[in-house]
A protein has these predicted regions:
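Non-catalytic regulatory/gating segments with a bias toward low-complexity or hydrophobic composition
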Residues: 1, 8, 43, 78, ...
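Residues embedded in well-ordered regular secondary structure
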Residues: 4, 16-21, 31-38, 46-67, ...
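Outer-envelope exported proteins of Gram-negative bacteria
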Residues: 38-40, 114-116, 179-183, 200-204, ...
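Phosphoinositide-dependent membrane-docking surfaces
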Residues: 72-81
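A conserved hydrophobic secondary-structure block that centers on an alpha-helix together
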Residues: 76, 175, 195-196, 202-205, ...
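Transmembrane beta-barrel domains of outer membrane proteins
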Residues: 81, 102-104, 168-172, 181, ...
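Periplasmic N-terminal soluble interaction domains immediately after the signal peptide in Gram-negative
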Residues: 85, 91-95, 103-105
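Short, solvent-exposed loop/turn segments at secondary-structure boundaries
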Residues: 90-91, 191-195
């Protein structure tokens, strides 16, 4: 829908692979509340029950949204609704507009088998503008002497990928139509150790009775979903804070070995020397966050 519907702004979340997508229709309507549109799938409102990640220094991992459970190849059509007409049908939940999604049914035809693949790649494109001319004076403040060292945050990011494989089967007669589909979605985010995997299975049968005066439409979906290491909000669990504020002039390769053996405690501990990076912010080693503070969310429904 991006760039195809007037007055609709669509942006991906900053939580990485598997994160929710923000859909805002005709501008923001609230400064403090949610501005996302309501999804209605086959006439059923789907509310986003995922976590937003929270605010403050210790915000948690964000969540996905209801429409992310769908196999894209199961979608027949998408339309938008806003204003009084949306409120009349769906009440106050539709104050920010409605995205109407209709899924596919079986068709009156012989057996039709479709196999599809979609592969996309992503990279970190725009970095915050930071000065790299002066090194570190004390703590994390970069206003020391001139330095010839160059630190590029892009070195932390990977090339992300999103691969969707799908197979659909449709068949039917004048009185009965059947539709089956199965799909896999496998994504690797641009951040290390961030991934999203989803497996969809759909079955739907439509039968007409009493000279087409009565229609019985039965459908079922089974979804297996795994979110691994979506980026946390706030400061402490967010690797991007320490990545972007890393003092210029220091050696970033030194912290890539993110853990050291602590003889006193007899365990591996995080390597993040506060003598270099200061204690003004609640930050952690970004490699430690992505490799040792794994936050996973699994769902079967």
């Amino acid at each position: 829908l991006a760039g195809k519907v007037a007055g609709v702004q669509i942006s991906s979340g900053a939580t990485g692979a598997g994160g929710a997508t923000r859909v805002v229709m005709r501008g923001m309507k609230s400064l403090t509340k949610n501005n996302n549109a309501l999804y209605v799938i086959d006439g059923v409102p789907m509310f986003n029950t995922g976590s937003s990640g929270g605010d403050g220094q210790y915000g948690s991992m964000g969540g996905s949204d209801a429409v992310a459970d769908l196999n894209p190849d199961d979608i027949e059509s998408i339309s938008m609704m806003t204003g009084p007409s949306a409120a009349a049908l769906y009440g106050s939940a539709a104050a920010n507009g409605v995205v109407l999604v209709n899924t596919k049914k079986g068709k009156k035809e012989k057996i039709s088998l479709t196999v599809s693949n979609s592969t996309t790649f992503s990279k970190a494109y725009i970095m915050p503008e930071m000065q790299n001319r002066y090194g570190t004076s004390s703590g994390l403040f970069s206003w020391g002497d001139l330095t010839d060292k160059r630190y590029d945050p892009k070195d932390f990011f990977n090339t992300g990928s999103n691969i969707i494989n799908s197979i659909t089967l449709s068949t039917g007669s004048d009185k009965n139509q059947t539709y089956f589909s199965a799909s896999t979605t496998n994504s690797d985010g641009i951040l290390p150790n961030n991934s999203y995997n989803r497996y969809n299975f759909t079955a739907r049968n439509t039968t007409n009775f009493l000279n087409d005066k009565l229609t019985l439409d039965i459908g079922a979906q089974y979804i297996i979903q795994n979110n691994k290491n979506m980026v946390g909000s706030g400061e402490y669990f967010n690797p991007l804070v320490s990545l972007y504020l890393f003092p210029r002039g220091e050696n970033f390769e030194e912290v890539q070995m993110y853990e050291r053996y602590d003889e006193a405690r007899n365990i591996m501990t995080q390597y993040w020397p506060t003598a270099i990076f200061g204690s003004e912010l609640n930050m952690q080693n970004p490699y430690w966050i992505m490799n040792r503070m794994n936050m996973n969310a699994n769902k079967r429904s």
